[in-house]
Swiss-Prot record:
Record Pfam families: GreA_GreB (PF01272), GreA_GreB_N (PF03449)
Species the sequence originates in: Nitrosococcus oceani (strain ATCC 19707 / BCRC 17464 / JCM 30415 / NCIMB 11848 / C-107)
InterPro entries in UniProt: GreA/GreB_C_sf, TF_GreA/GreB_CS, Tscrpt_elong_fac_GreA, Tscrpt_elong_fac_GreA/B, Tscrpt_elong_fac_GreA/B_C, Tscrpt_elong_fac_GreA/B_fam, Tscrpt_elong_fac_GreA/B_N, Tscrpt_elong_fac_GreA/B_N_sf
Lineage, top ranks: Bacteria, Pseudomonadati, Pseudomonadota, Gammaproteobacteria, Chromatiales
Coiled coil ranges: 1-26
UniProt keyword list: Coiled coil, DNA-binding, Transcription, Transcription regulation
Gene: greA
Identification of the protein by name: Transcription elongation factor GreA
Family classification: Belongs to the GreA/GreB family.
Top-level taxonomic group: Bacteria
SUPFAM superfamilies to which the protein is assigned, alphabetical: FKBP-like, GreA transcript cleavage protein, N-terminal domain
Length: 158
């Protein structure tokens, strides 16, 4: 199976969520199941069934996080070679050539992508157009509304 790229920061966030689920959430669910079981008949015990359902979700998320971390290629962005090219993990400041609108994106793996945090997947059309380019280069991105032209204003290696 191919390794999925993940920044060190993204891997740390997944580890923290996994730790929280294992040490805080899972024990609470087990306690809720035990309390509901003590109420008697399990066939008509809504609290018991709700707690069991929550347990299924928690265990599924734990398995999912463990799988993601086991199959991740963790990349420390601070140790990347700073040769002026756009690579995985960098933050790129763009200027729309037609509208002068500015945007800033960090190129991350699929697991970390979150447009609200300006993190775009390395597999997105914008990131694919940016990889290997340098500051001052122009790129074309195919958007639903047509082709958009951007200039790379800055590249940051945080």
């Amino acid at each position: 199976m191919n390794k999925v790229p993940l920044t060190e920061k993204g891997a740390q966030q997944l580890r923290e969520e996994l730790q929280e689920l294992k040490t805080v959430v899972r024990p609470k669910v087990v306690t809720a199941i035990a309390e509901a079981r003590a109420h008697g008949d399990l066939k008509e015990n809504a609290e018991y069934h709700a707690a069991r359902e929550e347990q299924g979700f928690v265990e599924g998320r734990i398995r999912d996080l463990e799988h993601q971390l086991a199959h991740a290629q963790i990349i420390d962005v601070s140790k990347l070679q700073k040769d002026g090219r756009v690579v995985f993990g960098v933050t790129v400041d763009l200027v729309n050539i037609e509208t002068d609108e500015e945007a800033s994106y960090q190129i991350v793996g699929d697991l970390e992508a979150n447009i609200k945090e300006n993190k775009i997947s390395i597999n997105s059309p914008i990131a694919r157009a940016l990889i290997g380019k340098r500051e001052g280069d122009e790129i074309q991105v195919q958007a639903p509304s047509g082709i958009i032209l951007y200039e790379i204003a800055a590249i940051g290696y945080q």
